[in-house]
Amino acid sequence: EIQVIENRYPSQIAPEYGELYRLVTEGNTSGHGTYQKILEQMDLESYLDYYCANLYFGNSQFDSFSTTLWRRAGEGETGKWHWEFSDATDTLGRNKVSNYSVNTYLCPGVAEDLFLQGLLKNKDFQTAFRQRMREYVEELTKEKAEEYLTPLLETYRVAVAATAERYGLRQTEEGYLADGDTIQEYFASRGEYILRY
């Protein structure tokens, strides 16, 4: 059985997730015993990827209350919560706030996230978090972005222009290619900035 919850507001924490949420936000997470209890209920790799991706991609609209969590419950399952990366509308330099130099840690959704702040009290979590962010920086380089995006942009170029024309949208081929340049510029510079923060 797969349980899925959409976590929307702090006052509406799903009961299934509430135990873990309270343990992290109200407990002494700096202690080894409490942290081990937390790890028994959450998939740490999933959470690190979820958070580091949102931070690295500069998701200025990100907050932990507009995400989806899931877990497999039942016999033979771990029952650990996993986080789903969802809305990426305001990422990769697509608006003035989410440019490559944005300190996403200061965005309200991150700075006010009690779950993250609770986990950051634990040294082991801090180490794992830093390590995962370094992996993102090493993996998501300008060269890899160009290698992936250049053929992708070319593949969709004609379709995007035709769709824009068909529906009377303002998107031009030049604008489409400029958006691709913005994304490549983002990857060229983001690693330098995210590690400073």
Predicted regions and their residues:
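Conserved ATP-binding subdomain of kinase catalytic cores across diverse folds
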Residues: E1-S11
